[in-house]
């Protein structure tokens, strides 16, 4: 069954990872190396087990656009979005034996170094996997 593991973050997390001091100091070179090593290892283990379908990181919220329908016409708003504190920072699509296994995989992200472990992770079954929930 397929599951989408969603990693969350906020603009401050992107600033931290991008080397920009803001509400919190920027990540040091050592912190960035530890984060990179963790993500390469985490994703590599999923690929090696055959459970990884796809993974992608997403750009910062300041680069996003939101579309809403107003008076029958689309209205485009460029980011950042003040009312949105938490955003999807990246995802891993996995194909594994069960919802419990997908949850165990996602829990591994909570052991990430630095700020990565603080924002939280959500696991959602892809349509068709509902019977496993």
Residue spans for each PLM region:
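Conserved, structured core segments of small domains
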Residues: 1-133
């Amino acid at each position: 069954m397929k599951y989408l593991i969603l990693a969350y973050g906020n603009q401050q997390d992107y600033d931290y990872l991008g080397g920009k001091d803001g509400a919190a100091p920027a990540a040091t070179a050592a912190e960035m190396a530890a984060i990179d090593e963790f993500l390469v290892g985490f994703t590599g283990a999923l690929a090696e087990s055959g459970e990884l379908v796809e993974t992608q990181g997403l750009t910062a919220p300041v680069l996003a656009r939101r579309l809403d329908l107003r008076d029958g016409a689309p209205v485009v708003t460029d980011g950042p979005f003040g009312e949105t504190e938490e955003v999807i920072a990246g995802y891993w699509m996995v194909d594994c034996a069960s919802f419990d296994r997908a949850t165990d995989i996602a829990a591994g992200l909570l052991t990430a170094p630095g700020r990565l472990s603080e924002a939280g992770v959500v696991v959602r079954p892809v349509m068709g996997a509902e019977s496993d929930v």
